């Protein structure tokens, strides 16, 4: 039965997902993640690579517990170049790609962002395709 406090976009996006909350800044949270990684096929993270390094969760760290794991980073900018290491979020990526300019109404003076978290969704689709 649908929970009336949950919107249809949330329900559509998160259908059949399972999740766990871990505080990776604590030894227990990190140990739990490494325990889960032992039997995982893929680990997808969406933190900056520097954060994963500080947490001791680089590819090399995960490979020690599971040599076959596929380690995928979904972060805003590449690891090289002028924006390397900078944080990003959907509105920023939309703006840098010119989406607000492309989607603004004719004659409007103010750009209009896509009403969905479009960049985040596209990244998810691209990751799924790359992994498979």
Regions found by a protein language model. Name each.
Residues 1-132:
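N-terminal helix-loop segment corresponding to the beta1-alpha1 unit
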